[in-house]
Amino acid sequence: MRPLKFFVSQSLVLRVLPLLAITCLLLMPQLARCTDDASSHDMSGMHDGMSMPMDNSADETPAKLLADKRESEFNHHLAGLLVLAAGIFMIAEGNIRARRPLVRQAWPLCFLLSGLFVLVFSDTELWPFNSQSWYFGLTHHAEVLQHKAFAVLLLALGVIELLRARGTLKAGWWGYVFPAIAMVGSVILLFHDHQGHAHGADHMEVMRRIQSEHLGFAVTGFGIALTKGLAETPSAWRAFFKRLFPTLLLVLGALLLVYVE
């Protein structure tokens, strides 16, 4: 029965992983194009009116804008808490693994929970929270598409690392899937659309701050991808990178926890 479970799990991941990689590659031009279009539309609106960064901003009440701001900050903070927890579990694993073997599965579960949360709660204008369909949101709003792409990447990381922790995926090359996915996520962050969060007279300052914060996320993400890959590679520095990898997870978690718009 166990060999059958191993075969099913491994064959499923082997089928899903290439599809995920192809999907991400196909999404990259669309993400960049949507972001560029939104930026061009925003600049054109600024030249015409110089009052609001987006045409539909005037239709949104201050209460709605404040609610959206708080929702976005909460989402980042909760994701940061889960990433922070993942780093703590990973650092503590060496000390308590002998007494609590299941702790090895704790940090992948943090990524799974984060992915599920982002998938469901990142855009509450979509069904079932509101009437807007997922198809419309994904095809008309770059930010929605990016959020769901992040969710899929987090879920993929969680599933693969959980299967590795349980001993289902034993091949050494599975250890390099995390760095590859983390690299893709970091690249997407560089194209992340922030147009919907900049409103009011100081919207340019808000935009610069949000872009700066997401650049910090991306740079830390690249560091996480690099150190995780080196931690999986046999070398004299392997032990060092195994410690540095969860440390950078703590850094990313802290950056997400202090995120403000």
PLM regions and their residue ranges:
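N-terminal secretory signal peptides that target proteins for export/translocation
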Residues: 1-12
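Bacterial N-terminal signal peptides
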Residues: 15-28
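Boundary of Sec targeting at the N-terminus
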Residues: 33-36
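Membrane-interface interhelical loops and short amphipathic "cap" helices
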Residues: 38-73, 124-143, 194-210, 261
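Hydrophobic cores of alpha-helical transmembrane segments in multi-pass inner/ER membrane proteins
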Residues: 80-90, 112, 146-162, 216-229
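Membrane-interfacial loop-to-transmembrane alpha-helix junctions, especially the N-terminal start
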Residues: 98-112, 171-180, 236-246
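Membrane-interface helix-loop-helix modules in multi-pass inner-membrane proteins
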Residues: 114-162, 190-197
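Juxtamembrane boundary at the C-terminal end of a transmembrane helix
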Residues: 255-261
